[in-house]
């Protein structure tokens, strides 16, 4: 019976091929991480655009409030003049029997509401624990790996750690922006409803 004894060279090559396979997986993970960061940055641009548009809406609401202040300040004199004119016209029309005393004008104002159904989803994640654990707890036979591959894997892990940190920071920033947008939408809805009530009150 012939017993095959694995040479140091064969043992070295087998372990080095294993390490090279891990490196390939880690490199593909870096590409995935770059794509995630790119998508998040595009998402951030869209959120900033929404935020910018809401700032314009706030400005429009303020203008509407200022105009309503002016209208309401003029209402007493307008109503007084309107009553006098209406009495004169009513008398003339009554005499000519063109209208009845009970004629009435109804008007309605429809309220427009702001809705934001945009939802941002991101279920992608970077899994780099396998490489990190490998470097923190190397096997006893790690001396059989080539120094170049070990250094390459170490650099890849550093890149993955930076990507994970960048993604975490981007998500935190976008969560803050989303909260600001959410609060603005609620306050704008309340402001629009108040303006609508003021308009209805001036027309009553």
Swiss-Prot record:
It comes from the Viruses. Keywords: Coiled coil, Repeat. InterPro entries: T_SNARE_dom. One of its GO terms (cellular component) is plasma membrane. Residues 159-181 form a coiled coil. Residues 9-71, 140-202 form the t-SNARE coiled-coil homology domain. This is Putative t-SNARE coiled-coil homology domain-containing protein L657. The lineage of its organism: Viruses, Varidnaviria, Bamfordvirae, Nucleocytoviricota, Megaviricetes.
């Amino acid at each position: 019976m012939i017993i095959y004894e694995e040479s140091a060279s064969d043992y070295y090559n087998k372990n080095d091929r294993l390490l090279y396979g891990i490196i390939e997986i880690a490199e593909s993970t870096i590409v995935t991480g770059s794509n995630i960061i790119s998508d998040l940055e595009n998402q951030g641009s869209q959120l900033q655009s929404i935020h910018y548009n809401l700032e314009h809406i706030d400005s429009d609401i303020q203008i509407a409030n200022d105009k309503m202040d002016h209208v309401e300040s003029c209402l007493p004199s307008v109503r007084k003049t309107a009553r006098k004119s209406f009495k004169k016209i009513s008398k003339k029309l009554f005499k000519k029997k063109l209208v009845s005393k009970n004629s009435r004008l109804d008007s309605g104002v429809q309220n427009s509401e702001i809705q934001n159904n945009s939802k941002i989803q991101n279920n992608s994640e970077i899994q780099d624990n396998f490489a990190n654990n490998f470097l923190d707890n190397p096997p006893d036979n790690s001396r059989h790996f080539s120094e170049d591959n070990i250094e390459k894997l170490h650099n890849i892990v550093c890149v993955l750690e930076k990507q994970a940190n960048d993604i975490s920071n981007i998500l935190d920033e976008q969560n803050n922006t989303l909260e600001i947008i959410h609060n603005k939408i609620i306050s704008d809805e309340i402001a629009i409803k108040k303006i609508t009530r003021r308009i209805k009150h001036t027309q009553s």
